[in-house]
Amino acid sequence: MSTAREQPIFSTRAHVFQIDPATKRNWIPAGKHALTVSYFYDATRNVYRIISIGGAKAIINSTVTPNMTFTKTSQKFGQWADSRANTVYGLGFASEQHLTQFAEKFQEVKEAARLAREKSQDGGELTSPALGLASHQVPPSPLVSANGPGEEKLFRSQSADAPGPTERERLKKMLSEGSVGEVQWEAEFFALQDSNNKLAGALREANAAAAQWRQQLEAQRAEAERLRQRVAELEAQAASEVTPTGEKEGLGQGQSLEQLEALVQTKDQEIQTLKSQTGGPREALEAAEREETQQKVQDLETRNAELEHQLRAMERSLEEARAERERARAEVGRAAQLLDVSLFELSELREGLARLAEAAP
């Protein structure tokens, strides 16, 4: 394969569909995810191709010819018929802009294919494989659902001088438009289902986060209660500190007042000595411990307040997520109802059109 063919002229991402070969009416998706769709120039055969690879096989390998026509059937869906492959391809894009870019590039490539055919018939050679087409890569973007109808006879290319549509072609066109509406409703329904699944996942994550915050809050509250009890114990211990007092020994009536005074002075000295040795450091240590514990309690209370604030915020987010999920469910329900109505109307329309087609000469 040449270098010119290996480098795409233009690439984008889209959901790929093919017309059902049995019914020629319904679309068959090529996969659940969007695929890369590219324009290539085959220098060996001097042709332009639209190629899309899914896994190990080519989903699209369509040679662009001058008589092909790319038709926009909705804001995000387009299609073209490939007579060589005997099928109709449909592409669903993420936005109308992507569809417009692909359609414009289709026109450029078709014109380049026409010039290539003319030069080939004249015996000339093309010096530029892209005929002035600038390479352009469209960055991938998340795909929304796309849709389109299909009856191969309705998608054949038409030249500018083609005659106006006959009555039979007009009926077929009406039937094709009905199929467009059906596929559009189905695509919107699938898009709403995806949105609902995403909201459900976000709700589960929010519930898990809220449960985790509640566990942390309970642990912080238990720690704060334990520290409060410790502070109360230390305060009670400080209030009930036993002050050493001198024991009064039984004195006989024969002891003199001087001996009693000397004994009292001796005990006072012992008390002062004990206070200087043990009382001061212990009180200072207990005061420091109480101050540190109180600081921890204040820090924990501040942290608890922050956690409670965060918990309230998480609960508000949870309620918003639940409300959003309910809205999504309501939208899905409305879409399902509208789809049922549209399918019923489409069925009646098909029956009427079938009767008209049978009655037409």
Swiss-Prot record:
<keyword id="KW-0175">Coiled coil</keyword>
<dbReference type="GO" id="GO:0006605">
    <property type="term" value="P:protein targeting"/>
</dbReference>
<keyword id="KW-0597">Phosphoprotein</keyword>
<dbReference type="GO" id="GO:0005829">
    <property type="term" value="C:cytosol"/>
</dbReference>
<dbReference type="InterPro" id="IPR044100">
    <property type="entry name" value="Homer_EVH1"/>
</dbReference>
<protein>
    <recommendedName>
        <fullName>Homer protein homolog 3</fullName>
    </recommendedName>
</protein>
<feature type="domain" description="WH1">
    <location>
        <begin position="1"/>
        <end position="113"/>
    </location>
</feature>
<feature type="region of interest" description="Disordered">
    <location>
        <begin position="114"/>
        <end position="169"/>
    </location>
</feature>
<feature type="modified residue" description="Phosphoserine">
    <location>
        <position position="159"/>
    </location>
</feature>
<dbReference type="GO" id="GO:0019904">
    <property type="term" value="F:protein domain specific binding"/>
</dbReference>
<dbReference type="GO" id="GO:0030425">
    <property type="term" value="C:dendrite"/>
</dbReference>
<feature type="coiled-coil region">
    <location>
        <begin position="191"/>
        <end position="243"/>
    </location>
</feature>
<dbReference type="GO" id="GO:0045178">
    <property type="term" value="C:basal part of cell"/>
</dbReference>
<keyword id="KW-0963">Cytoplasm</keyword>
<dbReference type="Pfam" id="PF00568">
    <property type="entry name" value="WH1"/>
</dbReference>
<feature type="coiled-coil region">
    <location>
        <begin position="254"/>
        <end position="358"/>
    </location>
</feature>
<dbReference type="InterPro" id="IPR011993">
    <property type="entry name" value="PH-like_dom_sf"/>
</dbReference>
<comment type="similarity">
    <text>Belongs to the Homer family.</text>
</comment>
<feature type="region of interest" description="Required for interaction with NFATC2">
    <location>
        <begin position="1"/>
        <end position="80"/>
    </location>
</feature>
<dbReference type="InterPro" id="IPR045027">
    <property type="entry name" value="Homer"/>
</dbReference>
<dbReference type="GO" id="GO:2001256">
    <property type="term" value="P:regulation of store-operated calcium entry"/>
</dbReference>
<dbReference type="GO" id="GO:0032703">
    <property type="term" value="P:negative regulation of interleukin-2 production"/>
</dbReference>
<dbReference type="GO" id="GO:0005886">
    <property type="term" value="C:plasma membrane"/>
</dbReference>
<keyword id="KW-0770">Synapse</keyword>
<dbReference type="GO" id="GO:0014069">
    <property type="term" value="C:postsynaptic density"/>
</dbReference>
<feature type="modified residue" description="Phosphoserine">
    <location>
        <position position="120"/>
    </location>
</feature>
<dbReference type="GO" id="GO:0007216">
    <property type="term" value="P:G protein-coupled glutamate receptor signaling pathway"/>
</dbReference>
<dbReference type="GO" id="GO:0005737">
    <property type="term" value="C:cytoplasm"/>
</dbReference>
<dbReference type="InterPro" id="IPR000697">
    <property type="entry name" value="WH1/EVH1_dom"/>
</dbReference>
<dbReference type="GO" id="GO:0098978">
    <property type="term" value="C:glutamatergic synapse"/>
</dbReference>
<comment type="function">
    <text>Postsynaptic density scaffolding protein. Binds and cross-links cytoplasmic regions of GRM1, GRM5, ITPR1, DNM3, RYR1, RYR2, SHANK1 and SHANK3. By physically linking GRM1 and GRM5 with ER-associated ITPR1 receptors, it aids the coupling of surface receptors to intracellular calcium release. Isoforms can be differently regulated and may play an important role in maintaining the plasticity at glutamatergic synapses. Negatively regulates T cell activation by inhibiting the calcineurin-NFAT pathway.</text>
</comment>
<dbReference type="GO" id="GO:0042802">
    <property type="term" value="F:identical protein binding"/>
</dbReference>
<comment type="subunit">
    <text>Tetramer. Isoform 1 and isoform 2 encode coiled-coil structures that mediate homo- and heteromultimerization. Interacts with NFATC2; interaction is calcium independent; interaction competes with PPP3CA for NFATC2 binding; interaction is reduced by AKT activation. Interacts with NFATC1 and NFATC4. Interacts with SHANK1; forms a high-order complex at least composed of SHANK1 and HOMER3; the complex formation is regulated by CAMK2A-mediated phosphorylation.</text>
</comment>
<dbReference type="GO" id="GO:0070885">
    <property type="term" value="P:negative regulation of calcineurin-NFAT signaling cascade"/>
</dbReference>
<dbReference type="GO" id="GO:0035256">
    <property type="term" value="F:G protein-coupled glutamate receptor binding"/>
</dbReference>
